[in-house]
């Protein structure tokens, strides 16, 4: 009898745990644009994922990525296109946010794509598996290819919101095109909103003693996988101009993947930021990292 009640207690405990888990979020159609995006993240990484015109998109951001105006910037927009496309014209399309394991999947009977963030490393993984042999094209899209004057309305996102100085500029990003990978980063301009506040408060004489978390801040990342550079293009998305750098898979395959490694650090030397990025890349073990992130 004691064994019976013990087993009953264990069963009830397990059932309660399952009942307490929220249901996955499932969409059965593609989105019109980025306003129909699904959140995804892990650790200090956040993404907005959606499928539009059979392409998979996501915005990407990491905590601490504040520019010279104290605006939390997105790292960029990423577009993934498969040929032949397993998501094109499929009535049984599913996009799912798997809440327990923390990833987004896009599936049809012809294939699937998983997008997930490593909980223990600042890395995003994209994994594709298709029934047919497929070619993959990955594009990094940026709207910060030149210094950009911020409008007064946009200023609400930064620390100048209360004391608008008249002209506020978001500095451009840097893009380093490699044959097999793409490196992108934002290096804060020498003059930051912290410097403006120090001047506004009449504290110039104490400036050397005040901590400025925005000075010499560099943040960005690198796209890498079994990819080769394909070319660039320009376009518009949501009334905003952008430039795209595209990489394609070396050869068609049923299984493909790539990763985006991120890094943020305060340093006046870009090579120090690159060294930190490469250190993270060397520490990665995708299979083990996936298992650890979903425990």
Where are these regions (language model features)?
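Sec-dependent N-terminal signal peptides
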Residues: 3-15
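Sec/Tat signal peptide C-region and signal peptidase I cleavage site
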Residues: 16-20
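Aromatic-residue-lined binding/catalytic grooves and analogous aromatic/hydrophobic interfacial grooves
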Residues: 21-295
């Amino acid at each position: 009898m004691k064994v019976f009640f013990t087993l009953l207690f264990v069963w009830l405990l397990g059932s309660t745990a399952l009942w307490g888990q929220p249901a996955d979020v499932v969409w059965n159609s593609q989105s019109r644009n980025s306003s129909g995006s699904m959140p995804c993240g892990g650790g200090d990484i956040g993404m907005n994922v959606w499928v539009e015109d059979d392409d998979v998109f996501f915005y990407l951001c990491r905590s601490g990525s504040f520019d010279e105006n104290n605006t939390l910037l997105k790292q960029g927009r990423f577009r993934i296109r498969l040929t032949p496309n397993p998501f094109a014209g499929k009535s049984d399309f599913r996009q799912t946010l798997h809440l327990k394991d923390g990833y987004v999947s896009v599936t049809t009977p012809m294939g699937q794509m998983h997008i997930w963030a490593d909980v223990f490393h600042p890395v995003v993984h994209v994994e594709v598996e298709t029934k047919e042999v497929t070619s993959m094209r990955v594009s990094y899209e940026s709207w910060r290819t030149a210094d950009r004057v911020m409008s007064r309305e946009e200023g609400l996102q930064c620390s100048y919101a209360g004391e608008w100085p008249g002209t506020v500029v978001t500095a451009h990003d840097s893009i380093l095109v490699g044959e097999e990978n793409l490196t992108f980063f934002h290096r804060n301009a020498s003059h930051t909103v912290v410097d403006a506040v120090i001047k506004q408060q009449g504290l110039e004489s104490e400036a050397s003693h005040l901590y400025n978390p925005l000075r010499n801040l560099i943040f960005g990342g690198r796209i890498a996988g079994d990819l080769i550079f394909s070319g660039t293009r320009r376009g518009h998305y949501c009334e905003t101009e952008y430039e795209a750098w595209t990489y394609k898979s070396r050869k068609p395959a049923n299984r493909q993947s790539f990763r985006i490694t991120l890094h943020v650090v305060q340093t006046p030397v870009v090579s120090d930021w690159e060294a930190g990025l490469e250190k993270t890349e060397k520490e990665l073990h995708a299979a083990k990292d996936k298992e650890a992130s979903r425990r």
